[in-house]
UniProtKB/Swiss-Prot annotation:
Active site: 136, 140
Enzyme superclass (EC): oxidoreductase
Annotated protein name in UniProt: 4-hydroxy-tetrahydrodipicolinate reductase
EC number, as in UniProt: 1.17.1.8
Purpose of the protein: Catalyzes the conversion of 4-hydroxy-tetrahydrodipicolinate (HTPA) to tetrahydrodipicolinate.
Keyword annotations of the record: Amino-acid biosynthesis, Cytoplasm, Diaminopimelate biosynthesis, Lysine biosynthesis, NAD, NADP, Oxidoreductase
Domain of life (superkingdom): Bacteria
Matching PANTHER family: 4-HYDROXY-TETRAHYDRODIPICOLINATE REDUCTASE, DIHYDRODIPICOLINATE REDUCTASE
Gene name of this polypeptide: dapB
HAMAP family for this protein: DapB
PROSITE patterns (UniProt xref): DAPB (PS01298)
Annotated metabolic or biological route of this protein: Amino-acid biosynthesis; L-lysine biosynthesis via DAP pathway; (S)-tetrahydrodipicolinate from L-aspartate: step 4/4
Residues binding (S)-2,3,4,5-tetrahydrodipicolinate, per UniProt: 137, 146-147
Cellular location(s): Cytoplasm
Length: 241
């Protein structure tokens, strides 16, 4: 499989290493500016590389990605950028009429499993308060994480009229049943931790996922790419790939 990388930060550097270990080829990298230390061919546009690649894997940011998605091309896409999620999904759905597109805010299959466990738990715990917490390294710039937003969306689909609460320090009233607390922690080198707390009367239940290495996200993207290149045009997630 010949892979075009969109972005060459810490995540796509891992993708490159792990993909080559699996026998795949990195044909080039799209970066905002050419970097002499990047060991691959530099491209400015997807259109420049689409005839050389079987798939593009993106771990970048909206500033780099969105202009590229406006180009005229047909190449399977694995997208892991977080930020501006609604705008991104709308654009990817549009592109999916002409190419297979895979998107996940978190490329870990374990996180996908967590969402399925959450879907099963919510109907059983209707009277429990829910609090969501995520923790990441001190270099992560967006908050809450795309994964936590995904977990909140699962809850929103199954509980009617819920309200996200991001900060309680100015509130001087009791917690209401429709609230879902959302908390972000940034520090050190934490790879990624996500907790869903169900708090009931005299008991609590916690669903938790802790990433121990960023390799799980890189491997998840590579596995998605391996499957995606054999799919027909369409919009794919872990639910249907």
């Amino acid at each position: 499989m010949k892979i075009l990388l969109i972005g060459y930060g810490a995540m796509n550097q891992r993708v490159a290493r792990l993909a080559e270990e699996k026998g795949h080829e990195i044909i080039g990298v799209i970066e905002p500016q050419k970097n002499e230390t990047t060991p691959y061919t530099h491209y400015d546009h997807i259109t420049d590389a689409q005839n050389e690649a079987d798939v593009a894997i993106d771990f970048s940011n909206p500033n780099l990605l969105f202009p590229l998605l406006e180009e005229e091309f047909q190449l399977p896409l694995v997208i892991a950028t977080t930020g501006e999620k609604e705008k991104l999904i709308e654009k990817l759905n549009e592109l999916s009429h002409n190419m297979p597109v895979f998107f996940s805010a978190n490329m870990s299959y374990g996180v996908h499993a967590l969402t399925k466990i959450l879907e099963a738990a919510i109907p059983l715990l209707q009277d429990y308060d829910i609090e969501l917490t995520e923790a990441h390294h001190n270099k992560k710039v967006d908050a809450p994480s795309g994964t936590l937003v995904k977990l909140y969306d699962v809850i929103k689909d199954l509980r009617q009229n819920i309200t996200p609460v991001y900060d309680r320090h100015e509130l001087t009233e009791q917690r209401t049943k429709d609230e879902v607390g959302i908390h972000s922690i940034r520090g050190g080198t934490i790879v990624g931790e996500h907790d869903v707390l169900f708090a009931g009367t005299d008991e609590t239940i916690t669903l938790s996922h802790k990433a121990q290495s960023k390799d799980i996200f890189a491997n998840g993207a590579i596995t998605a790419a391996e499957k995606l290149i054999n799919q027909s045009n369409g919009y794919y997630t872990f639910d249907n790939l």
